[in-house]
């Protein structure tokens, strides 16, 4: 168990990356440019990849299961020798191999799809958690599933309903590989027409040509960038929370127009998600202290008390 104090920098952790796209876009070749990869081939397509790496050709879930020696904690499995584990494809791994495996364990699950998917989810999570605990980055490759919605074609990873939901939940990043003006492009940003997940807020990236020096470690660099972004996001959130706490403390002590205007300038630097709520709170609490905002100058000033004549007029 790791204990992380609020003022400590978040440690880098292994990530889960999902890549999907049409045939021929080089999904497997790109994934194999990750650091020290092992490819678990469940789709019989490893020999088409431009970038050849060490490969397990799995025929059933037990091949993957036994490769890691999940049932034997004393002996390290083959997977332990690698930094990145690539599963190609996730659909065959989950919908075919793992589904058949849980039915083999309990034949009643063959006719009970709800419980079968529940058992599949438990087995899959256990496998993923062991890999993550061992510090392995994981890449799941999927085909592109196109669905027609009127004149619009929508794209999503090809995986059966609940298996896809499980994959999307555990993934840190989901990227779509496609051709754009003859060049291969990778985008993690979700749109109206395609599924994506962009935790690290990476821009759309042009994939380098195979054989170039940039392509050789392309996926390794992406994974490094994602890890750094997740780590820095945690640090940024910590700094944002600290800034809000300090602003609230100053608001409690704020009694003068000068202090109010200084606090207003600080409020402009708060994180956008918290800025509006704090400004509304500031206006309300300062008004109770006799300090209000001039609508013309947008500055705080002393709330003038009405004269006796004005009171009579009212």
For each predicted feature, which ranges?
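Interfaces that engage single-stranded nucleic acids at replication/repair/recombination sites
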Residues: 6, 25, 34, 38, ...
């Amino acid at each position: 168990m790791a204990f992380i104090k609020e003022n400590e920098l978040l440690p880098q952790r292994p990530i889960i990356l999902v890549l999907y796209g049409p045939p021929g876009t080089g999904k497997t070749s790109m994934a194999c440019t990750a650091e020290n990869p092992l490819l678990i081939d469940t789709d019989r397509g490893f020999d088409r990849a431009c970038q050849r790496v060490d490969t397990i050709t799995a025929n059933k879930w037990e091949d993957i299961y036994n490769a890691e020696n999940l049932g034997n904690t004393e002996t390290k499995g083959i997977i332990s020798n690698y930094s990145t584990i690539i599963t190609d494809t996730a659909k065959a791994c989950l919908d075919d191999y793992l589904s058949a495996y849980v039915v083999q364990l309990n034949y009643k699950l063959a006719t009970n799809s709800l419980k079968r998917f529940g058992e599949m989810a438990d087995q899959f999570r256990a496998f993923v958690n062991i890999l993550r605990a061992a510090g392995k980055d994981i890449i799941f490759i999927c085909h592109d599933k196109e669905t027609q919605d009127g004149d619009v074609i929508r794209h999503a990873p090809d995986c059966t309903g609940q298996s896809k939901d499980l994959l999307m939940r555990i993934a840190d990043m989901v990227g779509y590989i496609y051709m754009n003006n003859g060049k291969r492009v990778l985008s993690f940003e979700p749109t109206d027409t395609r599924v994506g997940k962009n935790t690290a807020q990476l821009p759309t990236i042009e994939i380098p040509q195979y054989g170039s020096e940039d392509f050789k470690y392309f996926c390794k660099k992406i994974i490094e960038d994602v890890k750094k972004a997740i780590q820095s996001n945690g640090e940024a959130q910590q700094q944002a929370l600290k800034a809000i706490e300090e602003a609230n403390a100053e608001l409690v002590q704020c009694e003068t127009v000068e202090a109010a205007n200084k606090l207003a300038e600080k409020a402009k630097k708060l994180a956008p998600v918290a800025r509006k709520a704090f400004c509304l709170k500031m206006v309300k609490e300062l008004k109770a202290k006799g300090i209000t905002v001039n609508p013309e100058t947008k500055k705080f000033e002393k709330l003038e008390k009405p004269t006796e004549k004005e009171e009579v007029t009212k």
